[in-house]
A protein has these predicted regions:
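Active-site-proximal cofactor/substrate-binding loop regions of enzyme domains
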Residues: 1-3
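Auxiliary Fe-S-binding modules of radical SAM enzymes
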Residues: 6-221
Length: 221
């Protein structure tokens, strides 16, 4: 695919290489296997062989492995320079590095203002290590009592680890009775209308509304 797309460069400006999401609903579909640590690492190596060549030719890498590949391969995330101004960030390429860098920069320039707020933050399995790191830093700098939890995707299957495909059903079932504090913070991409920060009429992929989830969990989302 990379070789075919490379014929259209520089009209093709960037290529995101993302692992296919395999749900548990695959009866009768073409047999496909999820990536392992080994195969994810092999994919990264192939992509980087091409990207080094493109870097010399075009000045940018052009093709980039998504964050999921690095997580699956258990390799460290690249630095900001690797991503050439993040042309594929909306496809999960460099999102981890960008968020972490931005968070710790803001933390370094903000005044420390101790607070006694108590909140619970949830995310998907993939992003949990990063979100936990950021929440722990917020606690250390501001005294916020932050409980960080990961939601396992039982609705689509445990192979689906991104926060954007979590449902209200899994949120309610896994967090009922476990929430600490007066607020539950969720990734906005869990909602269908993720351009809106309002809970009015917004809902999850399984049609459970935010209002219904708030009522079931007895907490403000």
């Amino acid at each position: 695919s990379i070789e075919e797309l490379s014929k259209y460069m520089p009209a093709v400006q960037s290529i995101a290489c993302v692992p296919v999401g395999l749900t548990k609903y695959r009866d009768g579909l073409f047999p496909m296997q999820p990536y392992t640590k080994k195969t994810a690492g092999e994919v990264i190596d192939i992509i980087e062989e091409y990207s080094e060549k493109f870097k010399k030719q075009y000045g940018v890498r052009v093709c980039y492995p998504s964050d999921e590949f690095f997580l699956k391969a258990e390799r460290p995330m690249p630095s900001e320079e690797y991503y050439d101004d993040y042309p594929q960030i909306d496809n999960g390429v460099g999102l981890w590095t960008s968020l972490r860098d931005e968070f710790f920069y803001e933390l370094s320039v903000c005044e420390k203002a101790p607070t006694h707020k108590s909140v619970t933050v949830i995310t998907g399995v993939a992003a949990y290590p990063l979100i936990k790191e950021l929440c722990d830093a917020a606690h250390e700098n501001y005294g916020i009592d932050v409980q960080t939890e990961k939601i396992i995707n039982n609705f689509f299957g445990e192979n689906i680890t991104v926060a954007g495909l979590l449902t209200g059903t899994d949120l309610i079932e896994q967090m009922r009775g476990k929430i600490r504090g007066e607020l539950l913070l969720i990734p906005i991409v869990m909602t269908i209308d993720y351009t809106s920060h309002s809970t009015e009429n917004n809902k999850f992929l399984d049609d459970i509304t935010l209002k219904e989830a708030e009522k079931a969990l007895n907490v403000k989302i």
